[in-house]
Amino acid sequence: MDRKPVLGFVGIGVMGESMVRNLIKAGYRTLISTRTKSKAEALIQEGAEWQDEVKDVAANADVIITMVGYPKDVEEVYIGEKGILKHAKPHSILIDMTTSSPALAEEIYQHALSKQLYALDAPVSGGDVGAKEGRLSIMVGGELEVYEKAQPIFEVMGQNIVLQGPAGAGQHTKMCNQIAIASNMIGVSEAIVYAEKAGLNPTTVLESVESGAAGSWSLSNLAPRMISNRFEPGFYVKHFIKDMTIALESAKQMGMLTPGLELSKKLYEDLAERGEEDSGTQALVKLFRDA
């Protein structure tokens, strides 16, 4: 693309807002749509152009990015009567950055091809901080030629950007990410509560362990929030449960053993039943403190 393409962005949540902000700062004309316009007001003030419906974004953008909540939302946004596949211009690039079903990503890819559209599945990891700082890890599935055209856009939003394979490969890679995090969050929560119950200062304990063999993104970024009782969402409990459900379904189809994932999903479901579904995933520590 010689000129900067016009971007469309559907879904302005915790991470989507920061991603759009970075795209605007990078000089991209960006059209946006989300269910609640009030959530987009700050971005509109910063230069984003509001569109009343998804079909308007699709009809007027060269590259359409989606970052919605659940696979059913992805299906509606792409395949519905007012969706992207029915209204996008031929040769547009469609990038779904929602964590969603690998099978749905493959379905969207096939639908897109039949309409001379080019689809990538590109879920992300890095949370609210990674989105704000443009340091997301982006896991991409799709064709190399399309990926290369979209790469300058990805580079505004992330730093670790890898084409993992054909359609669906990005979503499968994100499932690997979520499976690893699922058990890790149990360990991080247990470690913090152990330190507290042993009468230690958990902050200084963290200084000792985070740079050693126990180190992880969750330990460095979420354990401090656990210690200071900051449970606002960088990533929602309800969305993590959704991700683990998708991962378990995919793993079952492959005949895998997933005891850690199953336990983590159950614990997070218990947490959600206590009214924490809109909290950040670090709220898991509450289960261990209250035991």
Ranges and model annotations:
Residues 1-66, 97-98, 128:
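NAD(P)+-binding Rossmann beta1-loop-alpha1 motif at the extreme N-terminus of oxidoreductases
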Residues 19-20, 39, 108, 153, ...:
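Hydrophobic residues within alpha-helices
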Residues 35-36, 70, 143:
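Residues in the short beta-alpha loop(s) of Rossmann-like NAD(P)-binding domains
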Residues 54-117:
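Rossmann-fold NAD(P) dinucleotide-binding segment
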Residues 66, 134, 138-141, 162, ...:
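Active-site-proximal catalytic alpha-helix in oxidoreductases
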Residues 100-178:
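Rossmann-fold dinucleotide-binding core
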Residues 171, 215-279, 291:
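Interdomain hinge/lid region at the active-site interface
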